[in-house]
From Swiss-Prot:
Belongs to the diphthine synthase family. The lineage of its organism: Eukaryota, Fungi, Dikarya, Ascomycota, Taphrinomycotina. One of its GO terms (biological process) is regulation of cytoplasmic translation. S-adenosyl-L-methionine-dependent methyltransferase that catalyzes four methylations of the modified target histidine residue in translation elongation factor 2 (EF-2), to form an intermediate called diphthine methyl ester. The four successive methylation reactions represent the second step of diphthamide biosynthesis. The gene is dph5. Pathway: Protein modification; peptidyl-diphthamide biosynthesis. This is Diphthine methyl ester synthase. GO terms for molecular function: diphthine methyl ester synthase activity. Transmembrane segments: none annotated. It comes from Schizosaccharomyces pombe (strain 972 / ATCC 24843). It comes from the Eukaryota. Pfam families: TP_methylase. Keywords: Cytoplasm, Methyltransferase, S-adenosyl-L-methionine, Transferase. InterPro entries: 4pyrrol_Mease (IPR000878), 4pyrrol_Methylase_sf (IPR035996), 4pyrrole_Mease_sub1 (IPR014777), 4pyrrole_Mease_sub2 (IPR014776), Dphthn_synthase (IPR004551). Its main location: cytoplasm.
Length: 283
């Protein structure tokens, strides 16, 4: 059997009881280590499980799926995933490949940012499509995220923005020269995300990601020191919410007054928050 097991949001203790029982019976255990990160070292997992955990980077997951699935028709193999197992298309690819090899698959779910974001007080059923925001480079500044946010804005819906993670990435030069030299890990901050959104707004001028757009930023969700920030996009661009991981929400115009009341507790500037929130309620 091939198992995809969600680890939850923070540390080794967030795995479900069912997930832990399953891991302990597996002969081989991989930790998917590039679509998200756990906020503890893998040694903590190994200590809890009493088993070796193999780090599976992008290259292994995308290019060596048959190696991961090897013998899973005769023994139990697990892929551990931060958050929920189906939070990335890569994991769907693994399931499809396992099916092609006639290997049975089972998923064990867990909390992810997709549902934990409700901790900020915004109602989950009022969210539109989730978007991803990548690091802007000199010659690479994609704006497709802006168009997706625009669609959500037109419907009055909130937008969850997932921020870029660079783990075991190569520079363009090293990639072109075929050198397996990797850059240090980078995790996009909420403030940088806000800055990039404002840059695109300045270019597009469509009033989608304006300095006065209400937003929420969350950091280290599920941890003991998680932080929730509420304010304008301009305020977020100037505010540091600490170590990773971060996510951002742009508040939709169809926001309910109870949602705004909940958010007030996290406002970085209450007077300014109330001023901007009033314009949302006057829609």
């Amino acid at each position: 059997m091939f198992y995809l097991i969600g680890l939850g949001l923070f540390d080794e203790k967030d795995i479900t009881l069912r997930g832990l029982e399953t891991v302990k019976k597996c002969q081989r255990i991989y930790l998917e280590a590039y679509t998200s990160i756990l906020l503890v070292q893998k040694e903590k997992l190994e200590e809890l499980y009493g088993k070796e955990v193999i780090l599976a980077d992008r290259e292994m997951v995308e290019s060596s799926s048959d190696e991961i699935l090897k013998d899973a028709d005769n023994c139990d193999v697990a892929m551990l995933v931060v958050g929920d197992p189906m939070g990335a298309t890569t994991h769907a690819d693994l399931v499809i490949r396992a099916r092609e090899l006639k290997i049975p698959v089972r998923m064990i779910h867990n909390a992810s940012i997709m549902n934990a974001i409700g901790a900020c007080g915004l109602q989950l059923y009022k969210f539109g499509q989730t978007v991803s925001l990548v690091f802007f480079e000199n010659n690479y500044r994609p704006q497709s995220f802006y168009d997706h946010i625009k669609e959500n804005v037109s419907l009055g819906l909130h937008t969850l923005v997932l921020l870029d993670i660079k783990v075991k990435e190569q520079s363009w030069e090293n990639l072109a020269r075929g050198r397996k030299v990797y850059e240090p890990p980078r995790y996009m901050s909420a403030s940088l995300a806000a800055q990039q959104m404002l840059e695109v707004e300045e270019d597009r001028q469509e009033n989608i990601c304006t300095p006065d757009s209400l937003c929420v930023a969350v950091g280290r969700m599920g941890s003991d020191d998680q932080v929730i920030f509420a304010g304008t996009l301009q305020e977020l661009a100037e505010h540091d919410i600490g170590p990773p991981l971060h996510s951002v929400v742009l508040v939709g115009r169809d926001v309910h007054d109870l949602e705004l009341e909940f958010l007030r507790a996290y406002a970085v500037n209450l007077e300014n928050f109330d001023r901007v929130a009033k314009t949302y309620l006057e829609k």
